[in-house]
């Protein structure tokens, strides 16, 4: 078979992925918000994430992974037909795989340890032949027609013959072999010295193999997200170890050839991050260049790298590629290079944890990491003693391509320098500012105690700064935002959920069951129910299961404080944070223990529901409340929230009847649940609220208030008043990124006699937290309105 025919076959195969496949109407299983509960995937491990999703031979092929399982697991290879019928392949051997590549010459799909030909025959490379957590594939450097590379998460490197599947070990995988494990492949004695671990991407081009990892074995990574971690490396030939390119956390490595694994001379891209911002590395003509992008979400931070899954840059059949990174969808031009660095743009923010994605027919398929049996390091007192889910599970999310631009807003921030030493003439990395209307640079010289604010012109795509004087402690921070386009009205998707002023509320608590039952246990005050994969909610007599649920998933009390000023949270490190109320009527539900405050809604992702607002709450190892962001405000009387088969579940249903398909009524008609996608929450409405750090509070001279959340709100103003018979100056200070670095914003002289002074904040001003300082002792009110 000649190369021309290979190319024709590839075009035919990709045609199935990009447009020829049409959904068969009337034969699809039940779905809500693009999630089919019948397609949920389960394992017996502490996590069940989606490692790869690839269209091949008309079907969709999917693999799942468990956490740190280099020698196999209960995870499966799935084959999904155009009618969305799921087949669990008997060849499954599990593990922690996330690799995928189409080998053009042999017309085989490599996905995890599986090799699938044009007739959907599956061959397996067992863990005994290739131990390790398989994270990436790439084209071979010297024999690409006959071999492919595999890399592992612990820096292992193999080459595999695509015909015989013979494995050659080039760099030994970093996992210690169990005593009862007998490898069938002679393992290399070369053990990598590349810093970091927790490998992610792999790609070959320009005579080298490029590899990324995003973790480190330093014990500080479990608590301090600023710990040095991760590496970007390259490899040239057998006998070599990985050569360090840059010591930061990196994830995806790819280029214009994408799933084909590399090319001869094209560019390569790698996306990563540090405590300051995102880092984009570009290889062009043998030279590496670096760029910086802002972070939309901080839930992906954490020096251990566990919170990221596998960020990707993939072809979805559009003019631009799609990049997922730090909670945002991004346009990524196919021709992006150091010489042509134009076109990267934020599209919208998302809440799902996405491991891989692809175009299949007329929709995008996002493979998610939805519900993990283990909370890993993601525990905190505000959640109470709730037990984690009974069985790990995840699902696929099908969306129209247009939805990539329709989810959440993308206010973002990042730093180029953060408490760094600089010299006159030092130039910053180029920092992306295109795609946002409001673009502000903050030049903070901590050593010389100066702060300068600059508005970045609208025609600038990449902002670059040149240092004018030396400093031993210098920061350059960029904040970015657009106008909020949502209103305050909830979408009809939430019709049937009880409102805060409803007298009757069919609420209750729930938890995913274990023991492979694959149901959701749900208990109201009086009865016990179970929800199954067909979305049937049935009353069940099971006293043991009911007692277990009530004892393991109670709604905790007294995990937050409510006072006249605002919502006060004291986190696990003793830090104090204040949040606005969207509706004070929720106070009574919280006080009575009728509303869950915090719960994990996706793997290692907590959501906070307090005062009528949902907030995204990063894990404590990603700095927790310091990086909090509001998602949406609402008037829903939600008792409990969580996940099941990839769906977001809400309890607290109105007694009124509704035809909303998102409301699943029980078979006895006494209760119900709301089901949808976690990213439906954006449709509840824009974040709003009122409150402040002080309300008629006695404060001493130069006392500073608790931090009060400012990020993610619009139409903001502050009102100041005090009780003294003289004018008093109040200082307003900002923490731009939630790093604890406070800068002076403005001072306001507030007149005597309890006369209010009000200040409206301009739309271009964005900061994570605000605090107030009184220059004299007084009883003061600092009251903020976010409308």
Give the ranges of each region predicted by the language model.
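Repeated scaffold domains used in trafficking and secretory/extracellular systems
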Residues: 45-52, 92-106, 129-146, 174-207, ...
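Noncatalytic modules at the cell exterior or secretory-pathway interfaces
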Residues: 762-778
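Blade-level signature of beta-propeller repeat domains, shared across WD40, Kelch, NHL, RCC1
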Residues: 356-421, 639-698, 709
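A short helix->beta-strand "capping" segment at the edge of beta-propeller domains
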Residues: 27-46, 438-440, 444-454
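Beta-propeller blade signature
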Residues: 75-82, 159, 224-240, 279-285, ...
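Beta-propeller domains
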Residues: 61-94, 112-126, 161, 171, ...
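Entry beta-strands of beta-propeller and related beta-repeat scaffolds
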Residues: 59-62, 106-110, 144-149, 204-211, ...
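Residue-level signature of beta-propeller blades and closely related beta-rich strand-turn architectures
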Residues: 66-68, 114-115, 153-155, 214-217, ...
